[in-house]
Amino acid sequence: MLSRGRLLPIAFAAGIVASVAGIGTLLASDHQDTPETELNPRMDINDVYAFPGSSADRIALVMTTSSPIVGTNIASFDPNLLYQIKIDNGGDANEDLVFQITFNTGQLTAQRVRVVGPVAPTIPGTQNVLVNTNAAVEGPVGTNLGSDTGIQVFAGPRADPFFIDLEQFFNILPDRRPSTGALSGPSTSTASAFRNPGVDLLRPFNALAIVIELPKSQLLASTSPDAKIGVWGTISR
């Protein structure tokens, strides 16, 4: 099942709804939904997750991106993009809190991550405006980072298994592509079955992950054991 956040101007979103008492059904995104994300793979959100944290009073929020390029020499977080994880704790499908994540220019191994939040957005909804406040966490990519507020952050490559022979899949069921242009491709099937033995085509690839763990109390609007939050992620220019 697919759950979507609103489509933002030059922004891409994916999300879930979770009970903080016990994480409910997790719903994940598609990949390369639009020409914009296929032409700009660092804008492509793979999945958004909410997991129980390292203790009963904590929650982990995860957004993965860019899986087609991780493992190549162009793999890095885009310094020109704003990565956001948004939280609705009022049940109206509008964000009440945001995490805003940005990166500096450079190769992945030299990048630094800056995380602001959880904080009320400057303008909720379809606008994407940087919140003017100090970073909650800041430090090198690929490092476990902490803070005195209980927020922990990791940003960097992580294995994200997806067991499929994707090349043969599209030989069987060709993707919907235009007949001309940069994204053109075949429109007729050239195979009727998967290869035997199977090919784990995506095995060499990782995803770029942004992981934030923090006390649940920092996201909730009440102390009710039935309190729920909605979680989604966006990437925008």
Please give the residue ranges for each predicted region.
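Bacterial N-terminal signal peptides that target proteins for export
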Residues: M1-F12
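Terminal low-complexity, poorly structured segments
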Residues: S3-R4, I23, V141
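Bacterial N-terminal signal peptides
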Residues: I10-A21
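Surface-exposed extracytoplasmic segments
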Residues: L26-R237
